[in-house]
């Protein structure tokens, strides 16, 4: 009897420990690096560890980031950008060099716990018009061969992060899911290759995008509160779009003979700015709802149990392309300086812990001069130039700074350029229009940011992408103001 009692206690403790492991290891984050003033990798790694995050997904093999992850115990999925698919598809030797330099070197010498290599990133998006369809599988095969040759096949698995538009359902019921007809054969070849090599299928699912693309999309169905109108699929009840989308993939795999293939959700999250539905309230509601499911070990009707998933993203990226929308720069659960945007429990019961030892530029801002003429013909071109070289995405309709008046809009644009230019005197010399102020011009929830110091700042500011869409909107508002 004593033995049975001890065994029972041991069994319960084992179960509790196992559930703790599920909680800790069940969530990862995407660590993107498209920022003009990025936090030092060591600072970000400390941020990860203090918040109990033990898995990261990288979009490229940044050597500084990988070195910072050395011997931390953090599991890593390292990415290969789409622009490298062609050379890797065309040469086994090129694939072997890439694996040697970006995987083997870090695993053996630096003790980086690389678990996956992500070959490409959403290469079959409809917007790419088939550009990568002929080279993704060959690149995947060559990288796998290189991993085998390096003796890492048992530790490192290949995968291809795909957008959820690679499958569909004519009836919108998950059970009618299958891969898109025009890429179905290609998808089945990739799925078979993944299955043959014990590798996972990685999918990115974004309920926010469903809402962004369709103004008639039922808002409540995007969240996990159970308040959306449910879908009944032959007795399987779906009250949120994530579950329905995920199980559409499960059915697509199952009906083609791959029902047991492991699935990773490579990206899941909600942006906080740049659109009327991208705000702090919705982002917290979505991400906390998702984390509560993970903590409760809740899955979908077809795949019970917590998902293997990576939140998108860790930190805002103010240099990302905004071709998909202004929200693209605002997916982080932390601002660009590593400060939490809202209270979010990742499983420990506590909120997010901010980054430590972050250094900022001086407390000064570039604003519209009080005596500036709002009808000055140089005003429009000056604003356009500032927003072409900085981030003005918070000024759009429904965004955090969307209610500013004309003068405040101009000041925001000037200051954005001034900050990304490291507060150089020359960056606040719009003739007759701008001055430097030591008084914070922030308006309500619209914050006029002070940029962080970064050792890569000068290099980053030299590579700023053009953001004309926001500049055009500002020009239109200026023209309307002048006309009226």
Swiss-Prot record:
Propeptide: 461-484
Domain of life: Eukaryota
GO BP annotations, alphabetical order: carbohydrate metabolic process; defense response
SMART domains named in the record: X8
Gene Ontology CC, one term: plasmodesma
Matches recorded under Gene3D superfamilies: 1.20.58.1040, Glycosidases (3.20.20.80)
GO terms for MF: glucan endo-1,3-beta-D-glucosidase activity
Lipid bilayer topology: Lipid-anchor; GPI-anchor
Signal peptide extent: 1-26
Disulphide-bridged cysteine pairs: 366-428
Record keyword Cell membrane present: yes
Record lipid sites (GPI-anchor amidated alanine): 460
Glycan attachment points: 102, 129, 260, 409
Compartments, as annotated in UniProt: Cell membrane
EC number: 3.2.1.39
Any Pfam family: X8
Keyword line: Cell membrane, Disulfide bond, Glycoprotein, Glycosidase, GPI-anchor, Hydrolase, Lipoprotein, Membrane, Plant defense, Signal
Modification after translation (UniProt): Contains two additional disulfide bonds.
Catalytic reactions of this protein: Hydrolysis of (1->3)-beta-D-glucosidic linkages in (1->3)-beta-D-glucans
Catalytic class of the enzyme: hydrolase
Catalytic residue positions: 122, 267
Family statement drawn from the similarity comment of this UniProt entry: Belongs to the glycosyl hydrolase 17 family.
Protein name per UniProt: Glucan endo-1,3-beta-glucosidase 5
Annotated source species: Arabidopsis thaliana
């Amino acid at each position: 009897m004593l033995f049975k009692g001890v065994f029972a206690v041991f069994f319960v403790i084992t179960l509790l420990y196992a559930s703790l492991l599920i909680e800790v290891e069940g969530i990862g984050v995407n660590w993107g690096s498209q920022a003009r003033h990025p936090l030092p990798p060591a600072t970000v790694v400390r941020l990860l560890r203090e918040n109990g995050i033990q898995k990261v997904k990288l979009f490229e093999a940044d050597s500084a980031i990988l070195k910072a992850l050395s011997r931390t115990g953090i599991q890593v999925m390292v990415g290969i950008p789409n622009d490298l698919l062609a050379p890797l598809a065309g040469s086994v030797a090129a694939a072997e060099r890439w694996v040697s330099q970006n995987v083997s070197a870090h695993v053996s010498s630096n003790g980086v716990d690389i678990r996956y290599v992500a070959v490409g990133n959403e290469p079959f998006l409809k917007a790419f018009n088939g550009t990568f369809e002929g080279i993704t599988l060959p690149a995947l095969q060559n990288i796998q061969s290189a991993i085998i040759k390096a003796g890492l096949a048992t530790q490192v698995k290949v995968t291809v992060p795909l957008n959820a538009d690679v499958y569909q359902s004519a009836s919108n019921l998950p059970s009618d899911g299958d891969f898109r007809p025009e890429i179905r054969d290609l998808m089945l070849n990739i799925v078979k290759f993944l299955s043959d090599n014990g590798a996972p299928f990685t999918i990115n699912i974004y309920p926010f995008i469903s809402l962004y693309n369709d103004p008639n999309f039922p808002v409540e169905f995007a969240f996990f509160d159970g308040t959306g109108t449910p879908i009944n699929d032959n007795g399987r009840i779906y009250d949120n779009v994530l579950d329905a989308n995920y199980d559409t993939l499960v059915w697509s795999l199952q009906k083609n003979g791959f029902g047991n293939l492991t699935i990773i959700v490579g990206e899941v999250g909600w942006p906080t700015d740049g659109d009327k539905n991208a705000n702090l309230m919705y982002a917290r509601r979505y991400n906390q709802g998702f984390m509560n499911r993970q903590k409760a070990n809740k899955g979908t009707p077809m795949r019970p149990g917590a998902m293997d998933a990576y939140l998108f993203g860790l930190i805002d990226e103010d240099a990302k392309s905004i071709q998909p929308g202004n929200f693209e720069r605002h997916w982080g659960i932390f601002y660009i300086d590593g400060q939490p945007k809202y209270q979010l429990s990742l499983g420990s019961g506590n909120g997010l812990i901010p980054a430590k030892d972050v250094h900022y530029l001086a407390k000064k801002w570039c604003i519209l001069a009080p005596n500036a003429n709002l009808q000055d013909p140089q005003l429009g071109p000056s604003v356009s130039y500032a927003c072409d070289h900085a981030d003005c995405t918070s000024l759009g309709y429904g965004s955090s700074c969307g209610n500013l008046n004309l003068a405040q809009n101009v000041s925001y644009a000037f200051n954005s350029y001034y900050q990304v230019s490291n507060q150089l005197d020359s960056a606040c010399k719009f003739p007759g229009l701008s001055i430097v102020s030591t008084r914070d011009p922030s308006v309500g929830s619209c914050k006029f940011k002070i940029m962080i110091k970064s050792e890569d700042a000068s290099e980053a500011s030299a590579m700023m992408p053009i953001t004309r869409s926001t500049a055009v909107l500002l020009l239109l508002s200026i023209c309307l103001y002048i006309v009226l």
